[in-house]
Amino acid sequence: MKIALIDVDGHNFPNLPLMKLSTWHKKHGDNVDWYEPLTAWYEPPDIVYMSKVFTFTPDYPHPINARKIIKGGTGYFYPNGGNPLNEDVEHCYPDYSLYPELCKNTAYGFFN
């Protein structure tokens, strides 16, 4: 399967749910990459995951071509955040390779 990710808030800090979804899909043999709006029109992904943390962040401005679009996060579903990740996805080690510049020689701690 072809999986695409959209970090709606931008790439200024790692998005933990997208990182965990990336790990889970890669473990299952899927191809995971950032969503590219131009190439998606001739090779649409099977699933696009969109994650948004902040309610003040504008939504993704471009049309999305995919078989399935899944939105999540407090930015979309304040205050409860919407549906939680599946347990097996939640317990995956995050895929820090999605943010090579932000995660170079850096460790992030997430608390909830």
Q: Where are the predicted features?
A:
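N-terminal [4Fe-4S]-dependent radical SAM core
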Residues: 1, 74-112
